[in-house]
Amino acid sequence: MVKRIMIFIEGTTFYTKFPMFLFSKYGYKPIGRAIEIVNGWQKQGYEIYLCSYVRKRRYKYIKRIIDFYGMKYTEILCREKGEQYSEIVERIKPDILIEDDCKSIGGQKERCITNVREEFKERIHSIIVPEFKG
């Protein structure tokens, strides 16, 4: 069975430079060896789901950035209006969820895993990394 890894993009794999990240791919900078690591997992056969804080209407924008830097993925996930990150996690059902600690925006209450229902949460290996440290 193929394992699924879901990774939050901003703050976990990419550093964002305000306000450039709003309109330019150069506002996104890969953190450390994030691209190499993610591409290695993909090469090993993992399904890679990248989750962005941009809304669905800006999907093409974030896709261009990810493709520009050469990160491999199965799917890029963006929220619909009114959709919560926890709903995306529950829909994808990743084996592993990697996200940052959300320190600059309120910490634990802002993490994707926080509001995931227990029946899903117990099957997910949650990895929290320091924000912008990769």
Segments predicted by a language model, with ranges:
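Alpha-helical substrate-recognition element adjacent to the catalytic core
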Residues: M1-R79
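C-terminal cap/substrate-recognition subdomain and adjoining C-terminal extension
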Residues: R58-G134
